[in-house]
Amino acid sequence: MDCKIEIIPRLLHFKQPAGTSRVVYTTRKVWYLHLTSPDYPGRTGIGECAPLPALSCDDLPDYEDILAGACRRLEQCGGELDADALRDYPSILFGLETALRHLLTGSWALYDTDFSQGKAGIPINGLIWMGDFDTMLSRIEEKMAAGFRCIKLKIGAIGFEEELALLRHIRAHFSSREIELRVDANGAFSPADAMEKLKRLSELELHSIEQPIRAGQWEEMARLAADSPLPIALDEELIGCNTPEGKRKLLSAINPQYIVLKPSLHGGICGGNEWIAEAEKRHIGWWITSALESNIGLNAIAQWCATFDNPLPQGLGTGLLFTDNVEMPLEVRKDCLWFCNDDI
């Protein structure tokens, strides 16, 4: 297949700062790929490459050169994607995978599912970004009023006692049967105090905690996963672990209760499929999360997510992060993300 790819950089602006225990984002740079081919006249396949600064394994000074080279190779290979050659560049792989898929389907409905047909929504968690106590409390109450049954809080920045107070506030009004609570520490705890904090958090009947300690401490993380009364989900731990053998080693060494998959960070669609296969062999649960992509990337992740029969609330965005997002037939109804098939 003859093909051409145009690379279009774009700077997106957050409606409000997105804060974790590590960093606060106010803008977001992404690269859109526009793929065309005379074999598919009138069509353009669009993908999004969106490495996260200071987090993605492919957040590199020469990223644009690497991206341009990958696009040239796809053109030279007649549209045949060499996924193995791009294992170390998951955001580029994800962008190319989804651009190809969009070109071939000719629709934003990238896979044939009940979601893509507008028959079913995907349950999602309501995400509460870092802020001061009053701001976070207000956001929590907004999410609960909107109908979210799973709330995820970013913790590790405003003080552990204040964060416990927020969680207690929710539990004072809603039981664990009514509202599922997840927390994400983004590696904020130290190995020395992590277990004590996990014990205190577990008293509030939380579903899980993502990445309690910094990535790369396999022995300490394995100990927490084995002994913690609160289930542990790996997130940042998966970044840079790009080979099948590496994935097997990590999961066998730590044996977490869950893993959280972000295609832009964890190997694109094909890498995500590898993670899921290895996790399920070990009876490790998983869910899929977007990573501050615009609606182009969010739609691609949601379309892929819908191909699985996973009943857990997913960590997909709402499409409302940016002031200058791309229009996409996505809509949040109560606590589900829907694809509005009538709009395509």
For each feature predicted by the language model, list its residue ranges:
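Catalytic core of soluble alpha/beta enzymes
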Residues: 158-299, 303-305, 322-333
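Short, loop-centered acidic/histidine patches that primarily coordinate divalent metals
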Residues: 10, 36, 50, 264, ...
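Short helix/strand-capping turn motifs
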Residues: 309-314, 318-320
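A short pocket-lining beta-strand/turn micro-motif at the edge of beta-sheets
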Residues: 71, 80-82, 257, 282-288, ...
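Enriched - but not universal
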Residues: 34, 66, 132, 221, ...
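N-terminal capping/lid subdomain adjacent to the active-site entrance of alpha/beta enzymes
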Residues: 1-181, 186-188, 192-195, 200-202, ...
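Long, contiguous hydrophobic alpha-helical segments, chiefly transmembrane helices and signal peptides
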Residues: 124, 155, 288, 296, ...
